[in-house]
């Protein structure tokens, strides 16, 4: 242990013996709590990199910007690495590393120091770290153990206001990580003194039913902490785009904290209040940052009827920055597997189309109108647009797969499908909008499934999504006993957009098990779908349903 960090530990321990120096900002009876999410530029990983990250964590916890917060969430994988793993206390034991191990003889320095920092600041602190645990501590797990006798996990750790470890969650869906998964997936929650129970999950977990969606369905959790080191992917899965869409679809509070290295595809943090949208968010497009973003978060009542809207953070009022391939590294989705059509935007004119695009029996109807903005100036560049439909597995190498049914308008850097899912290379004013969309509407009839989630999926050239005030979303069953849902997603009539990258519906069917219309009649009956029901009759006509939905909507608005 270096002298510098020995003295830091001593100072924090002394301060830790005097908890409560920061005033509690929220009470159990309050309508709001105050949360902070940290966008954090990680140190280049080495055996000693954790010390620089730790200093950055402590500085943020003690900063003036964080003073009013009840809870602070730090990102995934920005503290330590496989070369500096630590044991983590079992939350059932209510261990306070700051008091029980002040000299860091069992737990690593950073765990003890952050326990003391939480105690000194009197805040709930959520961190993510690389954890080690002896294989013998989990006798029910009979899988082969590493030669050193240790499992290594990607783990969230929660300290309460006293510095006690009150919660621990280990990532279920690893993203190409050389780490262990738990023997069985964990559904983990923790209670707070301000009357909110949080669930938590990590990064790639957001695309799967367990544990994120399962905590909502089975336990009614309305608030989540979400550390991430997300690698953004065009056109459907950039960080803030995904965070906001998930929170909106589930109507929950999401505290999302992201690693911040845009040059390798990492950035994206925000606080989201369900159907009300974003309270604060950021997508960096430079070298990254170490900063906390704070918002008052309205609490959900048990009836989920609270509709108070918190004031947006002043950090939301910022100059729009147009993304380019040089400002942010983007992964690319396999859009060549979509059934797609180039949207022909004739220069110097306005236009409109009503088009249905199907892949197999899954169809999306697009009702679009635009106004031309003229030709690009010399050296200028602009995006082309495609309409696309996809019904199949989302496959990436060496990671868990999920089944999706997507409908979207998305940009391309050229006219070929191979140009889609890419940012333009030009920056600033050299990127020019070719059209303004004056009408955008997508109509789809989706089959129900045992587990599925549909959400609005949008992206602007600032790499931030549209807000709920800018669009209309409806999702309903045509009859009570049907097994399909009619979805309409449209730009509000008062809105016109010229900086759009993506406008679509993301249909996440997870493992696609027990999806209506998929499998044999015996399998459908086993899943609870009754033969000869109105749902089955509706399925037979679902190719025409999107056209009917949009025709009715157009008639009502005219």
From Swiss-Prot:
GO terms for cellular component: extrinsic component of membrane; plasma membrane; side of membrane. The gene is vanin-like. A lipid is attached at residue 531 (GPI-anchor amidated serine). Its EC number is 3.5.1.-. Residues 33-299 form the CN hydrolase domain. One of its GO terms (molecular function) is pantetheine hydrolase activity. Residues 532-558 form a propeptide. The keyword Cell cycle does not apply. Glycans are attached at residues 65, 103, 120, 128, 180, 354, 379. It holds the Pfam family Vanin_C. Keywords: Cell membrane, Glycoprotein, GPI-anchor, Hydrolase, Lipoprotein, Membrane, Signal. PANTHER family: BIOTINIDASE, BIOTINIDASE-RELATED. This is Vanin-like protein 1. The active site is at 76 (proton acceptor), 171 (proton donor), 203 (nucleophile). InterPro entries: Biotinidase-like_euk, Biotinidase/VNN, C-N_Hydrolase, C-N_Hydrolase_sf, Vanin_C. Induction: Induced by ethanol. Expressed in larvae and early pupae. Expressed in third instar larvae. Residues 1-22 form the signal peptide. It is found in: Cell membrane. It is a lipid-anchor; GPI-anchor. Belongs to the carbon-nitrogen hydrolase superfamily. BTD/VNN family. CDD domains: biotinidase_like (cd07567).
């Amino acid at each position: 242990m270096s002298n510098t960090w020995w003295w830091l530990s001593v100072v924090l321990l002394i301060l830790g013996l005097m908890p409560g120096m920061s005033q509690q900002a929220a009470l159990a009876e309050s309508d709001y709590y105050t949360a902070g999410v940290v966008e954090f530029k990680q140190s280049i990983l080495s055996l000693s990199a954790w010390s620089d990250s730790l200093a950055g964590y402590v500085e943020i916890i003690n900063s003036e910007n964080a003073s009013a917060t009840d809870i602070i969430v730090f990102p995934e994988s920005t503290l330590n690495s496989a070369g500096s793993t630590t044991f983590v206390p079992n939350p059932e034991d209510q261990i306070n590393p700051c008091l029980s191990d002040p000299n860091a003889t069992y737990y690593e320095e950073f765990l003890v120091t952050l326990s003391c920092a939480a105690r000194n600041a009197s805040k709930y602190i959520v961190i993510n770290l690389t954890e080690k645990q002896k294989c013998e501590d989990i006798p029910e797990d009979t899988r082969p153990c590493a030669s050193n006798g240790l499992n290594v996990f990607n783990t969230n750790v929660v300290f309460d206001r006293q510095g006690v470890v009150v919660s621990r969650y280990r990532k279920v869906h690893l993203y190409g990580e050389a780490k262990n998964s738990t023997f069985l997936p964990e559904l983990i929650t923790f209670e707070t003194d301000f009357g909110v129970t949080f669930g938590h999950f990590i990064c790639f977990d957001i695309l799967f039913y367990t544990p994120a969606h399962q905590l909502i369905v089975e336990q009614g959790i309305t608030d989540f902490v979400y550390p991430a080191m997300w690698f953004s992917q065009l056109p459907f899965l950039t960080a803030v785009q995904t965070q906001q869409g998930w929170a909106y679809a589930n109507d929950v509070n999401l505290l999302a904290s992201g690693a911040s290295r845009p040059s390798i595809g990492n950035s994206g943090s925000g606080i989201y209040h369900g159907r009300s949208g974003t309270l604060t968010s950021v997508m960096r497009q430079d070298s990254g940052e170490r900063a906390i973003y704070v918002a008052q978060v309205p609490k959900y009542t048990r009836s989920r009827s609270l509709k108070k809207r918190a004031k947006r953070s002043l950090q939301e009022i910022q100059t729009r920055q147009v993304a380019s391939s040089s400002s942010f590294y983007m992964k690319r989705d396999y859009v060549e597997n979509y059934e797609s059509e180039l949207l022909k935007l004739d220069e110097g004119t306005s236009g409109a189309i009503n088009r249905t695009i199907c892949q197999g029996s899954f169809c999306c109807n697009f009702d679009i109108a635009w106004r031309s903005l003229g030709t690009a100036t010399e050296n200028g560049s602009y995006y082309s647009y495609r309409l696309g439909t996809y019904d199949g597995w989302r496959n990436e190498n060496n990671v868990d797969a999920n089944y999706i049914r997507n409908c979207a308008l998305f940009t391309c850097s050229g006219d070929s499908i191979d140009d889609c899912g890419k940012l333009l290379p030009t920056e600033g004013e050299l990127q020019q909008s070719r059209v303004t969309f004056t009408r955008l509407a997508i109509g789809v009839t989706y089959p129900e499934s045992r587990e599925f989630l549909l959400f609005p999926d949008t992206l602007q050239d600032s790499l931030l999504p549209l807000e709920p005030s800018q669009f209309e979303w409806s999702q309903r069953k045509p009859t009570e006993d049907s097994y399909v849902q009619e979805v309409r997603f449209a730009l509000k009539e008062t809105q016109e957009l010229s900086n759009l990258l993506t406008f679509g519906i993301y249909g996440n069917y997870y493992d696609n098990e027990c999806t209506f219309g998929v499998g044999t009649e015996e399998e459908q009956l086993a899943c609870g779908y009754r033969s000869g029901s109105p749902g089955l009759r509706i399925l037979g006509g679902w190719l025409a349903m999107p056209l009917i939905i949009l025709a009715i909507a157009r008639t009502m608005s005219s």
